[in-house]
C-alpha cells in the first residue's frame, strides 16, 4: 500500500541563485544525499510502463483481473485454513508462493521495490509490510495479518485478511470485527457517481464510535497493470486532496487499517515492518473492487473460490 508523505513541507522556497555562480549549493547537497533509486519489480521483464492517471479497464482487462483476484483470494483462503500455532510466517510465505505459481501467476510482492517475500505477514502490533521469517513462530492468541498479490497475464489482484490464531482475546476479536466492518462500509459506497471521499467518510464514520483509530498515512490505491496505480483511496476524510469521481471500469484496492490504541506508527530497523508506537494491536482487511455500472464487484471474494 502506498504511503503519503508531505513533500511540500520539505520543499521550502529560497531566493534566486545567480546563474554565473553555477549550481546552487542546495542542489549539490540534494544530489549528494539523494536516496538510492528503488529496486524495480523483476516480474515481468517485458511489462509495459503503466499509463498515468486513473485507468478505466476494458471488459477484456476486467476478465483477466477477475482471474488475478481469484488467485489471490484462493491463496488467502488456503492460508487461513492452514495456519496453526507452531508454524512460522516463513512457512506461510512458502505456501503462498508455491500456490500462486501453481495457479499460473507470479507473486506481485516478491521483488517489488526490493521486498523479499510473496506475502506481508504481520503479527499483533505489526501494522503493514512485515517480512516473513523462518524463525518467527505463530502462537495461539496471535492476531495475524496476511497480505498478498497475484500477477496474472499482466494484471494484479491484491487482498489482505486478519486471522485469529487459536483463541484470541475479546479485544482482538472485536478489533478484527471492526476492521472488517470498516472495509465493507467503504465498499458499500462504491458505485458510479460517488466519490473517493464517500468511501473514506464511510470508513471513518464506522470506526470512530468504537474508540479505535485508523492509520492515516497508509492508503488504498488503484490496481491493474501496476500493483499501485492512481488514485490513492483514503480511509479518512482529507482536505485539499484529489476527490475522484467513481466510474464503471475503475479497479480499487480498499484497505483500512485499524489500531486498538494510537493511530501513529514507526518503522523497524529492517526498513519494511511498520508497528504501532504504543504496541497496541492492529488489524487490516483488503479487497480489490471493480466499479460496475450499478455498483461494485469484489474481485478477491474468498466465498467464490
From Swiss-Prot:
Transmembrane stretches, start-end: none
Residue numbers binding a divalent metal cation 2: 158, 221, 255, 286
Reactions listed under catalytic activity: Release of N-terminal amino acids, preferentially methionine, from peptides and arylamides
Biological process according to GO: proteolysis
A Pfam family this chain is assigned to: Peptidase_M24
GO cellular component: cytosol
Keyword line: Aminopeptidase, Hydrolase, Metal-binding, Protease
Molecular function in Gene Ontology: initiator methionyl aminopeptidase activity; metal ion binding; metalloaminopeptidase activity
Cofactor: Co(2+); Zn(2+); Mn(2+); Fe(2+)
Entry binding sites for substrate: 129, 228
Enzyme Commission designation: 3.4.11.18
Cofactor binding comment, as recorded: Binds 2 divalent metal cations per subunit. Has a high-affinity and a low affinity metal-binding site. The true nature of the physiological cofactor is under debate. The enzyme is active with cobalt, zinc, manganese or divalent iron ions. Most likely, methionine aminopeptidases function as mononuclear Fe(2+)-metalloproteases under physiological conditions, and the catalytically relevant metal-binding site has been assigned to the histidine-containing high-affinity site.
Residues engaged in binding a divalent metal cation 1: 147, 158, 286
Keyword Nuclease (UniProt): no
Subunit structure: Monomer.
PANTHER family with a match to the protein in the record: METHIONINE AMINOPEPTIDASE
Function in brief: Removes the N-terminal methionine from nascent proteins. The N-terminal methionine is often cleaved when the second residue in the primary sequence is small and uncharged (Met-Ala-, Cys, Gly, Pro, Ser, Thr, or Val). Requires deformylation of the N(alpha)-formylated initiator methionine before it can be hydrolyzed.
NCBIfam families: met_pdase_I
Similarity annotation: Belongs to the peptidase M24A family. Methionine aminopeptidase type 1 subfamily.
Name recorded for this polypeptide: Methionine aminopeptidase C
Organism: Synechocystis sp. (strain ATCC 27184 / PCC 6803 / Kazusa)
Amino acid at each position: 500500500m502506498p504511503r503519503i508523505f508531505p513533500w511540500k513541507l520539505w520543499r521550502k522556497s529560497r531566493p534566486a541563485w545567480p546563474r554565473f555562480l553555477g549550481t546552487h549549493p542546495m542542489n549539490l547537497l540534494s544530489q549528494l544525499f539523494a536516496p538510492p533509486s528503488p529496486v524495480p519489480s523483476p516480474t515481468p521483464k517485458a511489462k509495459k510502463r503503466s499509463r498515468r492517471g486513473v485507468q478505466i479497464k476494458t471488459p477484456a482487462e476486467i476478465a483477466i483481473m477477475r482471474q488475478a483476484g481469484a488467485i489471490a483470494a484462493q491463496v488467502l483462503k488456503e492460508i487461513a485454513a492452514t495456519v496453526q500455532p507452531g508454524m512460522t510466517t516463513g512457512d506461510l510465505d512458502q505456501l503462498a508462493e508455491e500456490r500462486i505459481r501453481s495457479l499460473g501467476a507470479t507473486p506481485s510482492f516478491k521483488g517489488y521495490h526490493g521486498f523479499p517475500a510473496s506475502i506481508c505477514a504481520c503479527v499483533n502490533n505489526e501494522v503493514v509490510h512485515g517480512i516473513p521469517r523462518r524463525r518467527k513462530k505463530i502462537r495461539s492468541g496471535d492476531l495475524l495479518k496476511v497480505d498478498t498479490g497475484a500477477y496474472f497475464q499482466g494484471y494484479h489482484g491484491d487482498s489482505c485478511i486478519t486471522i485469529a490464531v487459536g483463541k484470541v482475546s475479546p479485544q482482538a476479536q472485536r478489533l478484527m470485527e471492526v476492521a472488517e466492518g470498516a472495509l465493507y462500509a467503504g465498499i458499500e459506497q462504491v458505485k458510479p457517481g460517488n466519490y473517493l471521499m464517500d468511501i473514506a467518510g464511510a470508513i471513518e464514520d464506522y470506526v470512530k464510535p468504537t474508540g479505535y483509530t485508523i492509520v492515516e498515512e497508509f492508503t488504498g490505491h488503484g490496481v491493474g497493470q501496476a500493483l499501485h496505480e492512481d488514485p490513492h483511496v483514503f480511509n479518512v476524510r482529507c482536505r485539499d486532496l484529489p476527490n475522484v469521481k467513481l466510474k464503471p471500469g475503475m479497479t480499487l484496492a480498499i484497505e483500512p487499517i485499524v489500531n486498538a490504541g494510537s493511530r501513529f506508527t514507526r518503522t523497524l530497523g529492517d526498513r519494511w515492518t511498520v508497528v504501532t508506537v504504543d504496541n497496541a494491536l492492529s488489524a487490516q482487511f483488503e479487497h480489490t473492487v471493480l466499479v460496475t455500472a450499478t455498483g461494485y464487484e469484489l474481485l478477491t471474494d474468498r466465498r467464490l473460490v
